[in-house]
Design a protein with these regions (language model features):
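Acidic two-metal-ion nuclease catalytic site recognized across multiple nuclease folds
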Residues: 173
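Nucleotide and nucleotide-moiety/phosphate-recognizing core
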Residues: 1-122, 130, 135-141, 149-162, ...
Length: 173
């Protein structure tokens, strides 16, 4: 791509900052941000600013992908037997309202709740039960969309504009 999408600015804020502020506003601090290399901490940290409670986690396998990063997070003892809100910088319009709605709508028997835009699910914005989802994804490298659809889950239908996935500045045009 050539440019780090986390640092693409929308309305004067980097996409990583927008994601972190939305999570913090939804009372989801500390926010754990996985980075590929130590230099990313300084660069992303300066884009986010010092006011949020951020825990930086270095990927054990550089650029391994979201499934490995999620599995690694779920293996952390601090994440066991609880809830974890997944979020990526790819969704700059995901707001605290979305995260609150996911919290409110998660069913008692659900392993997760996934936002849906009417055409497809968005697993990287799911609210997950850590123990159950670890059992689902551990060692399975099929797409998360497939794995999560097979799990006991709820769907939160959301405005497609909120779930617009941005990977390059051209996606904003």
């Amino acid at each position: 791509m050539g440019r780090d999408k986390a640092l693409i600015e929308i309305d004067g804020s980097a996409m990583i900052e927008r994601a972190a502020i939305s999570l913090a506003t939804a009372n989801l601090e500390p926010i754990r941000i996985a980075v590929a290399q130590p230099e990313d901490v300084e660069e992303y940290g300066s884009a986010i600013g010092p006011d949020l409670d951020i825990e930086w986690v270095l990927d054990s396998i550089t650029h391994a992908g979201p499934i490995d990063a999620i599995e690694e997070a779920l293996l952390d003892p601090e994440c066991e037997d609880g809830l974890l809100q997944l979020a990526t910088v790819d969704y700059p319009w995901a707001s605290s309202d979305l995260f609150f709605s996911l919290q409110d709508m998660l069913g008692a028997d659900d392993c997760l709740i996934m936002p849906h835009d009417g055409e497809r699910g968005h697993p990287l914005l799911s609210l997950i039960r850590t123990k159950e989802v670890l059992e689902i994804i551990e060692g399975d490298r099929r797409p998360l969309r497939v794995q999560f659809a097979e799990a006991r889950h709820s769907v939160l239908v959301e405005d497609p504009a909120i779930l617009l996935n941005v990977n390059t500045p051209a996606d904003l045009e």
